[in-house]
């Protein structure tokens, strides 16, 4: 680990580093022109989108937005929340459409064509760690919600997004950020011509001790190298990215420990928690005549020390454990979109296939004391291969009516080699998923949508093979590897074509099995079938040249199916999420942004007897640009509210306690944080 960190550190020190949230990205080599605003949310989607909840975010939407952590990039998606229940190097906690998505169980991310979510992961199924992304290099984010889109497969029942990085930068820059608690972030990036193409690079280093009583001691290194140009007359994009991080964690803590004065809100019980992780990836995107080819390879490692229950299961040594995951990921996709006719009806035909192979050499769980392993609970290896194929036909039935018929097929084959022989074995699974969408244009400003589709998420494939519980030695029943879901949506989109748009979507979503967080195991497990229905509203208004306003709200009702009323609530699922922002942006001058994010209270038990409180956070950012320099100031949690990012209800046992105690375990939101940003354009 030290060798990898050192290599990236050397790369960073050979260039001038610094930080700010502003992004500049016009094509290199173009003549200098006056900077203009490009708001992704103002892009015209009438006649293009297939659902009311589909959208695009990018450009100035990102560059003017103060964020506390990388994962908050996805909060540009209406109704999406990213929080944290442990250390800064771990994947975040996500919420959307009444889901507690844990670390990404039903929401997928693709980064320059590469899937981000990890399946059959040591910590959580669908683990979506975005810490390897450099926010300033994300040009555009395309998102969609619901299982209505044939080109998207696993972990996409609630939604998905595809992030695209810049091909080139208008100007290189170096940035420096200084924050409280010894926070320093360096970033430098530039692009230049190489032969007939353009080479872009970026190097980042971030370190902080955080505001918790236990120093987080974060050391993160990021790098990216991207070539855009022709390779043998084939338009290509080749990207190499490298990420390496170590950190110390303060996990969620029991409410009783704070109320008794044992610790304060930012205190800790176990000082040994934390982890390390790396991800090295190579992606290629190629335009082959009528076909688009995408290839990717990734090497990944994570070691995570956790202890949610303290002394519950082992009063002598404690419950601390390590989860370890090491793997190689290989895969790709091939797609083709053409305009044709069927019986004289104009049709857009989109067909494609994708393949993914995970070779997991370390899939381990150990009991630990002081981060030292003393007992192996599981040591597994896994191979998981999936092949998907899809097709959809968009019929332009009239000048106003579009109908899209789609179908997707997914096949999974997997093999587990376990330390306990009874848990070794292999199997396969497959499923078909039909999709249908209608779009009707009332006029040039107003479009109606209706959607239906089936989708799925995969389970950790060990649950399809296991016959013995490795922790207790008791018999264990196997479960399906692939879990179906179905959903429908109706809505509309209104766009003045002059800087104002407005969407409303009414949705329903049924799952055959919910992925649930299990506190005393520190992981996710398949649960009961569920149903959700809700409504979403999103609006963007470019009031005038420098001033823009956005607003979104989502209200969802969710419950487990098959249980009586009063015993069927879904824990940790927020039914109301709202966000709004006001941005004033003058090129070569002042930029000011004020954003508010709210999520409602949530029940923590199926009988609704225990709840967590709501959260409302206000972020503020201001910067001034003059010639080659820019100075900025971000104030996160402006009102310094004592809200909670996350809370759970489960049993734990402190060192001084003789019995287990059921309690709320919470992780506080960040204190007010002030960051000073300095940028120099190269």
Could you describe each region identified by the protein language model?
Residues 336-338, 343, 396-399, 403, ...:
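Gram-negative outer-membrane beta-barrel transporters
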Residues 549, 601, 623-682:
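C-terminal beta-signal and adjacent terminal beta-strands/loops
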Residues 115-145, 164, 479:
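Short acidic/polar hinge/loop motifs at secondary-structure boundaries
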Residues 230-243, 275-419, 439-441, 500-504, ...:
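Face-selective signature of the C-terminal outer-membrane beta-barrel domain
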Residues 142-150, 159-192, 211, 481, ...:
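Short strand-turn segments of transmembrane beta-barrel domains in outer membranes
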Residues 188, 285-288, 292-308, 441, ...:
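Membrane-embedded beta-barrel scaffold of Gram-negative outer-membrane proteins
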